[in-house]
C-alpha cells in the first residue's frame, strides 16, 4: 500500500470526517468542528521518549471557539500499523472534543471510548482488533498510509567528550578534545595569566 498523496493535515481532516460520520454518529456521539495538526504536546516529554501521543484543547482556549487536536510527530505513518496507531490516537482525542474535555478520562469518556472500540486504560487507549479492522477498511484502504515519518528531538548521541583543561595558578579553564590535548606541548602556558601551566583537570 502506498503512502497517501494528501498532506498530513488534509489526511487528518478527511479521517476525522469519516470517523465523525461513520463511527461516532452511529453510536450517538457528535464530534464538533475541530482543527487538526501535527505538533508537540504542551505537556509531557518531547521527542523519542514522549509519553504524550496527542492532545485536545477546549473551545475556550481557541480564539475561534473551536477544539484544537494535535497528534505527536513522534509517531510514524510509514507502516499500516503506524497509521492505525495514529488513527486510534486521533479517535481518542476526538472523544475529548465530544464533551469539550469536561469528563477528562472519566465515565463519559470511557463510555464513548468503549462504544467506538478503544480499549483500556483510558488515559492511554489503544484500538481493539475490531476497531483496527474498521479503521483499515474505512480509512486506510481509502486514504492510504499516513504521510509522515516520525520525528525525534533527541538527536544524535554525543560520541566524543571534551576534556577540561585548567591553569593551576589562576583557575582559568576550558574544554577541548583529546586530539587537541595530544597536540599541546608538554608544558603549555596559561592563555590568561602567562605564568601558570595548563593541566588536564
Residue ranges and their predicted role:
Residues 2-81, 101-201:
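Metalloprotease/metallohydrolase-associated module, dominated by Zn2+-dependent proteases
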Residues 84-101:
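Active-site recognition of the HExxH zinc-binding catalytic motif
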Amino acid at each position: 500500500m502506498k503512502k497517501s498523496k494528501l498532506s498530513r493535515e488534509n489526511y487528518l481532516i478527511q479521517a476525522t470526517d469519516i470517523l465523525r460520520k461513520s463511527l461516532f454518529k452511529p453510536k450517538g456521539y457528535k464530534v464538533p468542528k475541530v482543527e487538526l495538526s501535527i505538533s508537540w504536546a504542551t505537556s509531557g516529554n518531547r521527542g523519542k521518549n514522549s509519553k504524550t501521543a496527542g492532545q485536545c484543547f477546549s473551545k475556550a482556549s481557541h480564539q475561534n471557539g473551536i477544539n484544537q487536536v494535535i497528534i505527536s510527530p513522534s509517531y510514524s505513518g510509514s507502516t499500516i500499523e503506524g497509521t492505525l496507531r495514529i488513527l486510534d490516537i486521533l479517535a481518542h482525542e476526538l472523544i475529548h472534543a465530544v464533551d469539550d474535555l469536561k469528563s477528562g478520562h472519566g465515565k463519559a469518556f470511557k463510555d464513548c471510548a468503549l462504544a467506538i472500540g478503544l480499549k483500556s486504560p483510558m488515559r492511554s487507549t489503544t484500538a481493539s482488533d475490531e476497531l483496527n479492522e474498521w479503521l483499515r477498511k474505512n480509512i486506510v484502504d481509502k486514504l492510504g498510509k499516513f504521510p509522515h515519518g516520525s520525528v525525534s528531538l533527541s538527536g544524535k548521541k554525543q560520541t566524543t567528550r571534551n576534556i577540561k583543561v585548567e591553569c593551576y595558578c589562576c583557575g582559568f579553564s576550558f574544554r577541548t578534545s583529546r586530539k587537541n590535548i595530544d597536540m599541546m606541548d608538554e608544558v603549555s602556558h596559561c592563555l590568561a595569566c602567562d605564568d601558570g601551566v595548563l593541566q588536564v583537570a
